[in-house]
Structures are given as structure tokens and as C-alpha cells.
Amino acid sequence: MGDERPHYYGKHGTPQKYDPTFKGPIYNRGCTDIICCVFLLLAIVGYVAVGIIAWTHGDPRKVIYPTDSRGEFCGQKGTKNENKPYLFYFNIVKCASPLVLLEFQCPTPQICVEKCPDRYLTYLNARSSRDFEYYKQFCVPGFKNNKGVAEVLQDGDCPAVLIPSKPLARRCFPAIHAYKGVLMVGNETTYEDGHGSRKNITDLVEGAKKANGVLEARQLAMRIFEDYTVSWYWIIIGLVIAMAMSLLFIILLRFLAGIMVWVMIIMVILVLGYGIFHCYMEYSRLRGEAGSDVSLVDLGFQTDFRVYLHLRQTWLAFMIILSILEVIIILLLIFLRKRILIAIALIKEASRAVGYVMCSLLYPLVTFFLLCLCIAYWASTAVFLSTSNEAVYKIFDDSPCPFTAKTCNPETFPSSNESRQCPNARCQFAFYGGESGYHRALLGLQIFNAFMFFWLANFVLALGQVTLAGAFASYYWALRKPDDLPAFPLFSAFGRALRYHTGSLAFGALILAIVQIIRVILEYLDQRLKAAENKFAKCLMTCLKCCFWCLEKFIKFLNRNAYIMIAIYGTNFCTSARNAFFLLMRNIIRVAVLDKVTDFLFLLGKLLIVGSVGILAFFFFTHRIRIVQDTAPPLNYYWVPILTVIVGSYLIAHGFFSVYGMCVDTLFLCFLEDLERNDGSAERPYFMSSTLKKLLNKTNKKAAES
């Protein structure tokens, strides 16, 4: 290695020279990347202005309440429709028109009603009976029965027929049900359309599907919501258990790092082994059972995931996946056993550092709070922007009309030329839009909103990384630990980051935000091109998405190490990124093995916590723990709380381990700098711990003499 060093250094910069005044993070530093700091402040001012404009023009009621043909809200308090929460379609069959997909509005009159119709009636029959008072509530407001039947139906004052309906998403849909495989409304398989002819119930089904294309998705969402309402208490208990396990693991790492790492490795192997055994037992148990040999391909997608657990092929797939993971982990442990010892020494050192800076374990809460603020501002601004359009009215006509889909004014339409040429046409509320400059810029404002979210979120993450790196670097470069540590290393690092390096953090976050917004645009274009048959375009899009994904991962890695250099030396972003990159390239073998081995060990720790809590949740929610068998709530889909607990447990474990991860990365870079700066002599002693020196066969001469 020593023979290669001069040539290797020439390609990737020169090693750090010994500096007798260097004692860790530099305190006398200046502001860096001031221009980027100014740009960030201006962008935040612009972002606030966009939010104010959106909140001024936006109206979230458009998302919550349905609107009638006049653009008035149904069920909103303080309006004339306060007691009319449901939207009623005069002729829902019209919703099957392709115009719905273009205008997002059914070409039929719509009014707000107190309740959906519960009986079958035609206007022709109800007009001359006592049912007319009931029927009239489904006519346009202010309707007076002083017209002929044909004129009333032609003007769209009343629906031709009422069909028993049920409310769904505040809209009235036909109460269609199946009896012995036959679709029916009430006791009928056909209905009279009010014009003297009878139509099939399937016409209503098509109209209802187009009027609410997410019917099945909403039903699935409602079942999932029901599961959450009865299981949220147990989900929280599961997450608390995950938090307690993570905290206990971190505390044990502080005192028993080496033992805990080996216990963690063995436990992961045992957990995977038990998973393989359980899958095999289930696979064997299903042998010979009726329907268990159906293939996953033949079964297709099912919303009830319990169906898959009755198939042998499902458990075979699980067993193969777990076996592959088990073999990979065992092989990695065999070939990397020597490097694992050094990685354990780094983790031990990180445990000591975290022990001296215990408040660092609470810093993820600060990052979480700031990220929640970013998400809340972005989401609220997006909602207000999307609802800041004005009511647009368009011409609808069942018969051919040259003015169909043209904009109109409902107040002047009755006396307009369009009304005279198309007597059956109606000027009806179509959607929310607008023709002003602000409305034309809405798409751009939404993109700006998303871009600022990425920029600010990455800035918050960068601030956390620089803060933790500064605190842990103070620990490493303290020759006499903990005597040479500053009083409040975390708060000092946080203050330095905000005071001197806001611009550098903004620069790194900006680069990452640009790549991320490009990835979002590529995803949007990919969705638009899915229907296209151009194979070249699809291939190009896939390549671009892959390249930008790799670029984002590389930039995140480079930024992380650049922030460590910023925390230590106080240099600007570009200089820090270059120095960090060259330092890592000069020690590429150690980076590829040591740093990644520690990441792998932390991943095993997360898997141990997530796997343990996930298995416990699985046995609890599937009523397999006899002691609490009657306590577990009945569920539509038991995978809902299980997946929630698993994902939540991973996020909690990741939050705790991220502090350790940043500590290890910081100590690793400091360790590499230490090897380049110092040689172990009395004048240039190593700052690394005695354990690391022993593993690397390094000694401080002064210590050896004593």
C-alpha cells in the first residue's frame, strides 16, 4: 500500500499536512456561499408570497363539498344549501358520456338535496298524484308547476325519473344490488326513463361508474379506515414497543457495543432461520388442501390478502426469499469477518461519542418537527392553489350543437344567440378554472411549490447532518477525552451551522432539489406516456429515470461527506465536497469495506427491531397468541395494522440509528484525516482510540515510552 501511495495521491489530490494548531472543528471561521444564502432567503420570501396569494384565492371547500350546476356548495354552513348535503343527478346515465372524462362534469343538471330519493317515480306519473310534493324537492329551486310536461323536461327543471339511491361521497347513486347474479334496483331489472321507454339497469351502472370512477377504491379505503379505528390503540402500543427496543438497543450499544453487534448478527440469522422454518411448516400443512395448489398468476390480484396465505406457492416464495437473504448474510459475514472487527471498533467509538453527547439522540425530534412544518406548508399551499380557480360555465346539449363545450354566462345565456340556435342547450357549471394570468400560472406555481418543498426539506436534513457532524468531530479531535470536549458540543455545532454555513447548506440542498424535481417531472411524463406504443420513448424514459436515480444517490452521498468537512473546517460547499471526495478516493478500499460494513451492521439492527415487532404484530392480529386471543380486534384486512406497525417501527429505528450512522461517518472521515495528518510521534500523536490503534497496529511513541 505504501508503494502505491504517491501515484494514488497524485490522482486524487494531496493528503492533509500536519498542522500543530489544528485541534478539531475550527471556531474562527467566516461565512460561506453567501450568494446561495441570499437566494434561499429570496426564495423563502417568494414562497411565502405564493402561499399568501394561494390562501387569498383558494377555497378548500371545493375539495370537501360537491357543487351543483350553479357552482354552489352542497351542505356548507351559512348558505341556502346548509341542510342539503347531497348532490343529485337528474339523469345519471348521461354521466357515461365521454364528455365526463374531458370536462370532469356530467352533462346533466345537478342540484343539492336534503336526502337521496328512496322510491321509484316518473315525473309523468307523479305530476297528477299526491307524490308530487315529494317529487318537487328534486326539481330546480323555485320550480313552479305552470309548464307542460314536455317543456319542464326540455328546460331541465325536473328529472324525468327518480330512482332509489344511496349517498356515496356526498353524491346520490342508484341503489344497485345483485340478486342471483342479476343487477336490480329495488325489485326491478329495468326502469322507465320518463319518456315512455324502458332501459336496462346496466345503463345506470355505466353512468354511476363514470360519475364516481373510484367507487371500489373508496370502499377499500373505508374498510381500511374501519380497521384503523378499531386497531389504532394496538398500533400505538406496537410503535411504543419499537421505540423502547430502539432506545434499549442504543443504551446497550453504549456499554456492550461488541457483544451487542455479535448478538445482533446471531439474532438476525436466527430470526431469518425461524422465518424459513415457519414458511416450510405452513407449506407442508397446506399439502392436499383443496384450492391450495392454485398459482399466484391464475389467482391474480385480490384485495383480501388472506386469500394468498391459503396458497402453497405463497409460502414457497416467502421461503425462497428468506433463504436467499440468509445465505447472502452468512457469506458476507464469512468474507468480511476481519473488517467487521474494525467496524465494531468504530461502533464502540461511536457509542462513546454518543455517550458524551447524549442530547444528540434527541436531535432527530428537531429534524422531524421541522420536516413536519415543511410538509404542512407544502400540502396546504398545494390544496389552496388547486382550489383557487373560478367557476367556469359551459354549454351542454344532448343533441348536436356547434356551441357544445363552449364557455358561457348563466345570467345572459337565455337571451344569447347560442340559446336561440340550440334551444335544448343549457349553460351549466362545468369546473373550476380561469382565464386570468394567475390562473394560467397555476401549474408553474405548483411546480415552484414542489421545488421549494424539496429545497427546504433537504436544507433541514443538511442542517441536522452538519450539527451532528460538528458535535462528534469535537469528540474525535479531543486528545484527552472528555476533558478537551467543549461544554455544549451539539448546541455549538448548531450555532456555527446557522451562523456561518446557511449558504453552503442551501447550495447542497439546491443541487439535490433540482435533481429531485427533475425525477418528479420524469415520473409525470412516464405516466402520460404509458398509453403510448412508442417503445423508443419508453426505453429512453426508463434510462433517464435510472440515471437520475443514480445521480440522486451519488449527490446524497457526496453532500453527506461535504457537510462533515464543512462542520470541521468551515470551508465552502464546493471546497468541502472536493476535499471529502478526494479523501475518500485516497482511501477507497477502506470506504468500500469499513464504512459499508458499519452500514450493514446498522441495517441488521433495524431488521432485528422491525422483524421482532413485525412478528409480534403478526401473531397478535391473527389471533395466534392464546393469552390475548380474545383481545385482538376483528379486522377486514389484518395486514393493515401489521404493515403500519412494520413501517412505523422502521422509521422509529431509523431515527435512532441515523444518529449513530452520522457519528460513524464523521468518525470515519476524522479517522482517515488522522492517519494522513499524524504519524504517532510525540509531536504528531494519533487522536484515534487505543482500540483502533491496536487493530491497525498503530501506536503513539510517547504512550509507548511511558
Curated annotation (Swiss-Prot):
Sites of Phosphothreonine modification: T14
Where found? Cell membrane; Mitochondrion outer membrane
Q: Which organism is it from?
A: Homo sapiens (Human)
Tissue-specificity statement: Present in supporting cells of the inner ear (at protein level).
Q: How does activity depend on pH?
A: Optimum pH is 8.5.
TM helices/strands, residue ranges: 34-54, 233-253, 257-277, 316-336, 365-385, 458-480, 505-525, 564-584, 600-620, 639-659
Q: Which GO terms describe its molecular function?
A: antiporter activity; choline transmembrane transporter activity; ethanolamine transmembrane transporter activity; transmembrane transporter activity
Catalytic reactions on record? ethanolamine(out) + n H(+)(in) = ethanolamine(in) + n H(+)(out)
Give the GO biological process terms: choline transport; ethanolamine transport; phosphatidylcholine biosynthetic process; positive regulation of canonical NF-kappaB signal transduction; transmembrane transport
Q: What is this protein called?
A: Choline transporter-like protein 2
